[in-house]
Every structure is written in C-alpha cells, then in structure tokens.
Amino acid sequence: IHKMLNPRSIAVVGASPKGGYGGRLLNALLRSKDRVNIYPVNPNYDEISGLKAYKSISDLPEAPDLMGVVVPYDKVLGVLKEGHAKGAGSAVIISAGFAERGTDSGLDLQRQVGAFARESGLRVAGPNCLGLANVRDDIWPTASSRTLGGLTGHIALVCQSGATAFGPFLLRAVDAGIGLSHIISTGNETDLDFSDFARYLIDDPGTRVVAGFVEGFKDVQKFIAMAKLAAERGKPIVLIKIGRSESGARAARSHTAALTGADSLYDAMFKQYGVIRVSDYDELLEVAQLFAYSRKPRKPGIAVVSHSDGINAILKNFGWAANPADVTGFARGQHFPTIMRHMIDEPTVGTLVVASAGGADQVPQVIAMRDNTEKNVAYFWTASRADKDTLTTLKKSHIPIFYTPQKLAQGLKSLLRYHAWQDDCVADGAAQVPKATEEQMSALTAFQNAGRSALSERESKEVITAWGVPAAREVRASSAGGAVEAAQKLGYPVALKVDSADILHKTEAGVVRLGLRTADEVRQAYDEITASAKRYAPDAVTAGVSVQEMVTGGVEVIIGIQYDAQLGPMLLFGSGGVMVEVFNDVALRHCPITPAEARRMIEEVKGAKLLRGFRGKPAADIDALAATLVRVSQMAVNLEGRIAELDINPLMVLPVGQGVKAVDALVVLKTLEV
C-alpha cells in the first residue's frame, strides 16, 4: 500500500492519446512528472503526451511502484502477471467488466485477479475503480477528470465508489476549503478493501481522520480490528454507510430478529467501536474537519457567542448551548475579544462557538482567540457563502465551519461522544471468549443431528443453562395427572405451557397458563392447552406440557442473539415480556462484549429505571444481569454457524443478590431455511 500511495514510478498500462480512461489517467499524472517517472504502456504508440511509450511492461527501464491498469477486462490478469514478473510494487485496476456485470464469468475473473494478488504479493486496488490521489504530494493516479492542487489537509477519504470520491466529495471539499491528505476509491475490492487502506492511514502521520463512504464490508472482523486500533491511536473514523433500507429482510422467527433490522445492527456496531456515522456528503466533511482541527474537549460545556438573539434561540433548541450570549453592537468592536475570552474561560466550557456573519474585523479576532487557547473554537456561518473574502480567511485558518445548526449540533455531539467513548474503550480492555466445552456443544449436537429447525422451550433452556444462564425449574408431563404430580413436586403456584418446537410463540397460540394454585386448576389448564395447541397447529408435534415454577418479584427483560451475514453474532438486550415488539426498547452490540459494555447496554434501555428500583419496588440484581449478557455474548461466538437466532424472553431479573432466571427461551437452528 505504501508504494501505491507514495509511488515514485508509475506505468500507465493502456495509456492513450485519444481520451477515455487511459487518456485521463495519463493526463492526471502529467502534473507530477517532475517528481514521478511516468511510463505510458501501449504497443500502438511510440510517444503519448510527450512521453516515450513502451510496448510492454517488460520493456520498462525499471520496475514501477504502481501500475495503472486500463485494458479490456480479459487482459487484466495477464497484465498483473507480467507486472509481477517485472517486479512491480502494486496496481490500480481502472478496468471494469468484473463482478459488477452480474455474470458468473465476471465474478470468476475477479476472483482469479484477487487470488493472484494475494498469492503473488502484488497488491491491487479495484477493479472497477477510478484510482486514487496522494493529495499531499500532488500525485493523482486517477481516471477522474477532476484533479485539483492546493487542497492539502489532514483528512483521508476512502470510498468504495470512485464517482462519489472524485465527484461530490471532492467538489464539496474544494467549496468548503477542507483539505485532504488522500483520496482512494476501492471499487470492487477483490484484494485491498476499505479496512486495509484505513489501517494504513492510521499509521500515516499526516492523516488525522479517515472519512469513508461504504456500502458494506468484505471482512467485518478486519474492520473491527482496524476500528479498535484507530481508537487506541486517537484517529477517528467518520463514515457514510449507505443502504439503510430494510427491504429484502428475511422473515423473523424470534422476537430478536423482529426487533433488529440490518441497518440497526450496523448502527450498533459503529457505536460500539467508536465509528462516527453521518448521513450525507456535507456532514461527513464538516464532522471530519471538526475532528481534524479540534482537541479532546477538556469539558463538555459549549459556549455560543452571536450577534443575534434569534440565532441563539435557534441554537438553544438543539439542547447543548446552555449559555448563549447575544453581543449585538459588540460583534465587530474592540470588546468582542474580551467577550469571547470571558465565555471560553468559563470552567465548565470546553468549546466556543461563534455564530455570526463574519465581519472583516471579527474573523481575525476569532482566529487569534483560537490560536491563544487550548480549548476548541468552531464557527457557525450565518451569512451568504458569496461573501468570499472573510469566509476564505476562515477556511484557510482551519477553524471548523458549519452552515446549519443541525450539522453544528451533530458535529459537536459526535466530538463529545467519541472522546467519552474512547476513554471507556481504553479502560475496558478486550472482550474474552472462553473455548466452549464438550458438554456445552453436546447440548446442541443431538438436536442438529435430528434435522430440527427449532428447539422447544425446554430444549432451548438445556442449551442456555449449559452456558451458565439459570432457568426456572420445570417438569415435563404427558397427562393431566402427571401435570398435577409435577405441580405438587415443584410447589404451587405453577405455570403450564405446551412442550413443542413447532409452536414458537406460545402466548399467541393460547397455550400458556400462569399462576395455577390448585390441582383442579392444573387439570383444567392441561385440557385447555392441549386443545388450543391442536386448533392452532394441527400438525404440530407436541410432547405434552411443561410444568414450571412461577418466578415472581423480578423485572422482565429480553436477551437475544441474531447472526448477520456480514456482521456475524449480534447481541440484543431490552425490556421483555409479551409486549416486547410493541415497545421496541432495545440495545444492540456486536459479540463478544466486556462487562463494562454489558452495563452500558443496560443503561441504554428505558426500562433500566425498573431495574434500579421504581415506586417502592426493590432494586434488581444488575450485576447478575450484566454477567448473563457477557455469557450469552460468548455463547453467540461459540455457536456461530450452528444456530440462527436465540430468544430468552422473559429473563427475570430478581432482587439484588438473587440472580436471574430464564422463564422462556427459543433457539432457532442454522439448518432452518429462511
């Protein structure tokens, strides 16, 4: 990657004097020909754009650090092999015609290119990309028609879409005066992907922020490892993740699946690993700029100085400007620096926001304040962007500029949350996953071997108890008399439920009876449940009923597992019970989690108030709940590839010191066609 981003010799394979991608790539590189050896390669020409053209890569006078490949797709693999034989350092494949065609042949060819890149060590960006740019050194190996100098800064832009990277992002960065260190389009990512480039940029001293535009990740574990390292190094990752639509989601068998959409899983993962997600091009650049040119806030307080009380009123609506000052009449006077100093020196203030139209005398005063304080300064521009002189001065000063109160508020919130998260992340350490024991795995193996799609409640509890999750005591009964005997053994009151893997949501089927206190009630409940089961699912296989102890005096919560095709195991926690999908009060995390992360999950849920004791109720055993969340997250990793979903709903969190008990559980096996 270093040679790719810092080349001193570049071969343009497929260079052309006729325009097109080959012509644009060569023309973009001509600006750096005084610093980089540029070699056009095309057997049909002796000279292109004033440079000697070569018949083949083998004819080059040196092994190029980078090959820009612009040849028909069926010639690309041959070019890579020839380049490898020459000793080329890397390649950017502009050529299209691979997996994006949607054909088996295109996908197969792309796989061959990727396999060769990994086996040979000739690392590849693309195919189907627009190239890249080392903006800092003004080297632009890109087939984009847009190349601009003088835009140097500390933000690296990595996009899976080349048209987006060199189109709206580049144009907006120029318009906003936001400098970049690199622009990288990754295309189809047959070899190097977003995470690889971001990992390299974490080590780049000239890059302070990695900004990205992605649709998905080839290797989520690699992305997570990169994000963790970025947090340790203090380099924020700011992303637009497209594809928020939930269309095409599979039918949900468990409550957990119904409560989690694909996009909510990404949101949870980003939050867990400190990735700042934004919504649009402007927000990405403005937030990245704020991080690139701001320190860690010493205090969370934000002071706002404005020439308009109306602007202050607008900013107050966003909930973070507690002390706005209307300085009408002083905004352009000699007293303005004193006012700013008074505001920024407040002990609770970590950031000063100046909201103004940017007068010619005021802007230098704001810049001077930024240069003479260790606190952060940002600017909310309230005038027309056509007022170029003072706005240009602000841009050149690298004071973060925002143009809407919404994006200003979002940016400042992101800054505060990121640094708070970073402190927590460093303190947490790594999540642990003990290797599953033979006894734990055998709890599931028998059911899988039987070709089952889901487990009954009783069977599901056998699985979770193997991972240390306590469950309510129960006895299976196949007759009304047997149910009475079981109830007497457990002690009244009891609950009766049908024992069947074919009836997953028992409340809906009418096959649950609670709080039974006498033998007569148990007999009646048995008859009603068996009749209801036959009406609800005539073909269901049942094994009688499960007679369970009634667990009372606790708070109902749900813990669940879902496996995403890209993200892997995800853990859900929320307020539980039969209304769980109505309230949708949940927190999500990627598995495994640390004990501290478990407690943060608990605090995210509105129902956490009930756990702390509410209206005279005793406080619940939050320590036991947090430990259970950790164990279930470890279980999720251990059972990846073997189960599809897990619900523990409800899990009763009993008063402090009494632990937790699973009252109901559902395991959906991986073999289920969904």
Sequence positions of predicted segments:
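Phosphate-bearing ligand-interacting subdomains
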Residues: 52-116, 213-219
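ATP-dependent carboxylate activation and anion-phosphoryl transfer catalytic cores
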Residues: 260-261, 277, 388-392, 396-403, ...
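Periplasmic-binding protein-like
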Residues: 64-70, 90-93, 156, 208-216, ...
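Active-site nucleotide/adenylate-binding loops and adjacent lid/helix of ATP-dependent enzymes
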Residues: 144, 282, 288-294, 433-555, ...
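Hydrophobic, well-ordered beta-alpha structural blocks that scaffold small-molecule cofactor pockets
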Residues: 1-35, 40-42
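General beta-strand structural signal in soluble alpha/beta enzymes
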Residues: 39-41, 91-93, 117-118, 123-128, ...
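Short glycine-cluster motifs
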Residues: 146-203, 248-251, 271, 298-350, ...
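Peripheral docking tails and interdomain loops at the edges
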Residues: 86-88, 95-152, 238, 242-311, ...
